[in-house]
Design a protein with these regions (language model features):
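Short beta->alpha hinge that forms the Motif I/post-I loop of the SAM-binding pocket
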Residues: 34, 70, 95
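Rossmann-like NAD(P)-binding element
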Residues: 56-86, 90-91
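Helix N-cap at the beta1-alpha1 junction of Rossmann-like dinucleotide-binding domains, i.e.
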Residues: 36-37, 97, 150
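Rossmann-like NAD(P)(H) cofactor-binding subdomain of soluble oxidoreductases
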Residues: 80-130
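Phosphate-coordination loops involved in phosphoryl transfer and adenosine-cofactor binding
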Residues: 2-5, 89, 140
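Hydrophobic Val/Ile/Leu positions in short beta-strands of Rossmann-like dinucleotide-binding domains
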Residues: 7-8, 68, 145
Length: 180
C-alpha cells in the first residue's frame, strides 16, 4: 500500500507526471512549485488537488509522503529549510539521476522521524513543464531504488509500491555507488 496524501515538490515534466499517475490512482495529491502558472495549470487540468507557491507549510505538514522533482542543490536546500514542517513518519523520495551528491547530505541532517528513500525513474522526454505531464512515460521504464542503511522495511515497501503504481517495467535495487 502507498500513502494517501502525497505532496509533489517541483511540477515540471517529472513532478507533473508523478502527480498525474498518483491522482489517477486515487491519491490526494498536492504540489509546491515556484511558478504559479504551473500550479494553476495542474489544478485546472485535474493533475493535483491544490498547490502553492508560498505559505505551503500546511501542505508539507499534511503529507504522508513527499516526492521531490527538483535539481539536486534545490532539493537539498528545500529539505534543510522546510523539514520542520514535515509530519512525523513522513517518507520522502526523489527523482534525481545522480545520487552521490544528494543521499549523504540529506541523510546527514534529516530528522530522525522522517525517512528518505532515494529513487530514480529512468523515464523522461526532451520537453519540460507540467503541461507536458504524461503518466505513460513510466510504462516500460526502469525504476532504480538506492536504499541505504537508514531505510526501513516501510520505506522500501513505499518505493516498490510507488514504482508499481507508476507502471514501470523493471525495478532494481542498487547502492549509491552502483547507481552513479
Amino acid at each position: 500500500m502507498i500513502e494517501n496524501n502525497i505532496c509533489i515538490v517541483g511540477l515540471g515534466l517529472m513532478g507533473g507526471s508523478y502527480a498525474m499517475a498518483l491522482t489517477k490512482a486515487g491519491k490526494q495529491v498536492t504540489a509546491i512549485d515556484k511558478n504559479s502558472e504551473s500550479i494553476t495549470y495542474a489544478e485546472q487540468s485535474g493533475i493535483i488537488e491544490c498547490g502553492k507557491t508560498e505559505d505551503y507549510e500546511r501542505l508539507l505538514g499534511e503529507a504522508d509522503a513527499v516526492v521531490f522533482a527538483l535539481y539536486p542543490h534545490a532539493f537539498i536546500d528545500f529539505v534543510r529549510d522546510n523539514q520542520k514542517y514535515f509530519k512525523s513518519g513522513v517518507i520522502i523520495t526523489d527523482v534525481t539521476g545522480v545520487k552521490s551528491n544528494v543521499v549523504e547530505p540529506i541523510q546527514s541532517f534529516l530528522r530522525e522521524d522522517a525517512e528518505f528513500i532515494p529513487c530514480h525513474p529512468m523515464a523522461g522526454r526532451e520537453v519540460s513543464g507540467v503541461e507536458f505531464a504524461d503518466d505513460s512515460i513510466f510504462k516500460g521504464a526502469n525504476f532504480i531504488i538506492t536504499p541505504t542503511e537508514k531505510n526501513t522495511a516501510r520505506g522500501l515497501d513505499f518505493a516498490y509500491n510507488l514504482a508499481h503504481l507508476l507502471g514501470v517495467f523493471h525495478i532494481s535495487e542498487l547502492s549509491v555507488e552502483q547507481h552513479d
